[in-house]
Amino acid sequence: MKTTIANLLLILFIFYCATLAFLYFKQSSFIFFPTGISKSKEFLLKQFSHFEVNINHDGFNLHGWFINRESSPEHPLIIYYGGNAEEVSNNLFDLEKYEKESLLFMNYRSYGKSTGSPSQASLFSDALFIFDHFSDKYNISSTNIILMGRSLGAAVATYVAKHRQVKAVILISPFDSLVKIAQEHYPVFPVKLLLKQPFESVQIAQEITAPMMAIIAGQDRIISNERSVNLVEHWGGKSHYVTIKDAGHNTISNYPKYWDTLRLFLSKMAKRSV
């Protein structure tokens, strides 16, 4: 009997260790879900082809869309950072919801038509490069740029806001730390030791002085409201959040309140000088 129990425990231990090894070496596949552009979608996107841009960074092509409208303090450039499974061209079908802001939607490496492989380091490095490239090429002051990130993209926006002086930051379904999210979903694993790409936004949030608004989905089952609110509370600059109580993680932008909240914040920021 003792031998049977010991053998069972040994099998469980080996299985647990094997699972840890699998999670450690394959963690990128659990963090990033690159999405391409289907032929049918590519046909729909032809109407936006005049907005397409390609830039090269570290030998990789980064592809996206730049809607260059009149640039002024009242009409800033919004740089958008998508979620971990988001191909950002979906946002092009909501252009009418923005008034006169310029808009930049760039896909991460391996998303859409961008090449390469995504990682925390590459997302952060590319984001700074893209920011500087468009700011310099189109003579747009960094203080006339608003960063907007959704889910994982909120971590990218937070990182850029730490390293560049910007007009404001908008975070959709943000989180304080990917480690803490993983701990909530996988409490039996030592994720703090396993996670090589922690996206620890909360550690740099206090250093950011730009005003920030977060929009939170009340029924989010992926990023708990606690994770979002904790980031807001640690933000160095003026910050607040709005909760859309019936929205889920992937449906938040389907609610009119989402767009009303976004429009109100943009209107307030148009009057703000940096």
Task: Give the label of every model feature segment.
Residues 219-223, 249-250:
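Acidic catalytic loop of the alpha/beta-hydrolase fold
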Residues 170-180, 197-201:
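Active-site nucleophile loop of the alpha/beta-hydrolase fold
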Residues 60-134:
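Membrane-embedded segments
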Residues 8, 12-54:
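An N-terminal hydrophobic leader/cap segment in hydrolases
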Residues 208-209, 214-220:
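Short beta-strand/loop motif that positions the catalytic acidic residue
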Residues 247-257:
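Catalytic histidine-centered segment of alpha/beta-hydrolase-like enzymes
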Residues 140-151:
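Alpha/beta-hydrolase fold nucleophile elbow
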